[in-house]
Swiss-Prot record:
PANTHER family for the chain: 4-HYDROXY-3-METHYLBUT-2-ENYL DIPHOSPHATE REDUCTASE
Biological process, per Gene Ontology: dimethylallyl diphosphate biosynthetic process; isopentenyl diphosphate biosynthetic process, methylerythritol 4-phosphate pathway; terpenoid biosynthetic process
InterPro entries: LytB/IspH
The name this protein goes by in its record: 4-hydroxy-3-methylbut-2-enyl diphosphate reductase
Positions that bind isopentenyl diphosphate: H47, H80, H130, S229, S230, N231, S274
EC id: 1.17.7.4
Binding site for dimethylallyl diphosphate: H47, H80, H130, S229, S230, N231, S274
NCBIfam families in UniProt: ispH_lytB, PRK01045.1-2, PRK01045.1-4
Top EC class for this record: oxidoreductase
GO molecular function: 4 iron, 4 sulfur cluster binding; 4-hydroxy-3-methylbut-2-enyl diphosphate reductase activity; metal ion binding
Amino acid sequence: MTTKPPLTLRLAAPRGFCAGVDRAIQIVEEALKKWGAPVYVRHEIVHNRHVVERLEALGAIFVEELEECPDDRPVIFSAHGVPKSVPAEAGRRNMIYVDATCPLVSKVHVEAERHFNAAREIVLIGHAGHPEVIGTMGQLPEGSVALIETVEDARAFQPRDHANLAFITQTTLSVDDTADIVAALQSRFPGIATPHKEDICYATTNRQEAVKVFAPGAELVLVIGARTSSNSVRLVEVALRAGAQDAKLIASADDIDWSWFNGITTLGLTAGASAPEDLVQGVIEACRDRFEVTVETVKTADETVTFKLPRVLAG
């Protein structure tokens, strides 16, 4: 019998689903129970193909635009948030709609409105084209929000009024990258209005902090998540910056190239906020097939946050 090589697997805690993702998935499930299939969902409810396929099997139909939905079936808006024009159009068509926007994203929308009503010029730190950024910018008239993606953008930004500025941020960014951009803005515009509470969400921060703890001793870090998942992509970047020798983004155990493990004795494993736990366990089992695995849980925070369902689905 061949002896399996040893592998120490450092498992991040917390990892995977956050409260906003849990709530969004539950909204689709409860809508299907209440109204039956099909229920339409505008954009992937969360950025994870496995989650989407499971909900499709239950009767959810995913579309990119509201015009693809019939008037007489319920539609759900994804956790990332939508421009104001979307619920306005649904209302005009007398559609039943449920907004699954994460409450932490909605908080950023409220901040944007507050700054706009105070006649401040608004800077959004985020990634162009991400659904959350499109949704946040779409809360206000076109041209009201300037998007800044990098420190260089912050240094080059020319506001209309240096003394009347505010910034908000996409919730799923790298904590460190955002800090650098904020510092660049504040050095140029000391009076810029800041969020009441940091916009980077608790789950994004917690998952990045766990990776920072185990990355320095890891020869390889695997992050389970979709390439369209901003927070998952950031976890790979955080792992490399924190000292991991290598880091890869995988959708599931099927994506693993086992040549990555040549000479490896220490693996770090985590999952983005939209990746279900069964994918994590699948990677652990795949490792056990090839290695004598010792799992060490690296716990850096307790998460007790939960969000209520919209009133139309509660109770």
